[in-house]
Amino acid sequence: DLMGLILLIVCILIILIFLKDYIRLGGKKTTINKKQKMIVYEVHQNNKRIQQGWITDDQLPFQFGRNAGSGNDVVVVPEGTPADEAASVSRAWFYIQKDALGNYMVYSAELSGDGKKRQSEKKKLVVENGNTWKAMHTVKLQSEVRLKADQFQVILDVENPGES
């Protein structure tokens, strides 16, 4: 009888711990801390959405998606992040919300002959305050992308940036 009671208490505690985490995660999605920059992202592969989610700026660098490990990979990181700390991706769409103002770096990495990644180029991504404005385009490296963020989400499309 005592063992059964102890087991029941342990089970209830485990359920409560999981519920607490679930409620906290759910609460995060609805109440965004205004001081944090939010990046909501979608990963598409072969014109199909394979992943969707969101991150805060303190979770960068962040890998959006990978296309069979081929070259021309890209990642978005906070400005000033060293290249060797940046993960890399080959294709991504991401949305910048109105609180995500600031500067970011976009890194491009290519596979070298021995199959190891090396940094090839980087560019600056600037998110500014502005009126309703939506951008969707292929990133060209060695240039600066300026986006205006507002209550509508801004889309940046990154696809095979090594090709120009």
Where do the model's predicted regions map?
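Intrinsically disordered, low-complexity acidic Ser/Thr-rich regulatory segments
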Residues: 1-86, 139-164
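Forkhead-associated
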Residues: 73, 92-151
